Regions:
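Long, charged, low-complexity intrinsically disordered regions
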Residues: 2-20, 62-69, 74-78, 82-86
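Amphipathic, hydrophobic secondary-structure cores in small proteins
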Residues: 19-73
Length: 86
């Protein structure tokens, strides 16, 4: 899942949440709560561990109706996703 979209480089997120070390399903719950506190159209950067978190959180936010703008694997082995709130 090493997909990088141009929009991530150009996009400056309205908020960032660092969820390294947070296990499933708590990483999605924390992401969902953060998105609920944001305005429609705002963007959220989420830092996730490899494995289950990067497999599950992007899918779950899309199932909630939000837009996944990009996924980037960082040099430190973590992943960053950019989500636009519905």
């Amino acid at each position: 899942m090493n997909q990088k979209m141009e929009s991530m480089a150009e996009e400056h997120p309205d908020a960032t949440i660092d969820l390294r070390g947070v296990k499933c399903p708590f990483n999605f719950v924390k992401t969902k709560l953060k998105l609920e506190a944001m305005e429609s159209g705002e963007t959220l950067s989420v830092i996730l561990d490899p494995g289950e978190p990067i497999a599950n959180v992007p899918r779950s936010v899309q199932e909630e109706g939000h837009a996944l703008l990009g996924v980037t694997e960082r040099p430190d082995g973590l992943f960053e996703i950019l989500v636009k709130k519905a």
